[in-house]
Amino acid sequence: MSKIAYLFPGQGSQYIGMGKEFHDTYPEAQAVWKLADKVLQNLYWQDKREVQAESGHPYSMEQLTFEENPYINITEYTQIAMLTMEVAILKVLEAKGLKAEMAAGLSLGEYGALAAAGVMELPDLFRIIRMRGIYMQEAYPEGGAMTAVLGPVSYTHLTLPT
């Protein structure tokens, strides 16, 4: 029998509607969105629904991931949306009996891999990722960028703008 591995993507692969078919089809996925929303109600959304509704800021995981909004591409929100979607799909696969022998993730995806490995409780993972997104947004506000340059240092200096 073949070995199965789960691979989780990092930030950058998000889009409005990601995971919606899973959410609308499988109770296991819906439960993950509800759990994430419950954790965030206590941590961030708190009792701000009216203020957030007026400002346009998302006040539920469903609104953030399924309704058209600019926040899906803002790190503060992107990370919790990605993890919620990853864990929702993971729970559906597990309910169908598809168990992985290993899991790996790129950057943010490492937390999806932690969920797959069962090493942390989901509410804790949601709290950690929500705060990670906030801190990363504060450290690198909108408009920042990153690049990876492979090669000798002497070449790197020649290719970077001064």
Named regions from a protein language model:
Residues 2-104:
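Helix-rich "cap/lid" substructures immediately adjacent to catalytic or cofactor-binding pockets
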Residues 11, 38-56, 116-158:
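Alpha/beta catalytic cores of group-transfer enzymes, especially the acyltransferase/condensing modules
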Residues 105, 109:
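Gly/Ala-rich beta-loop-alpha elbow adjacent to hydrolase catalytic centers
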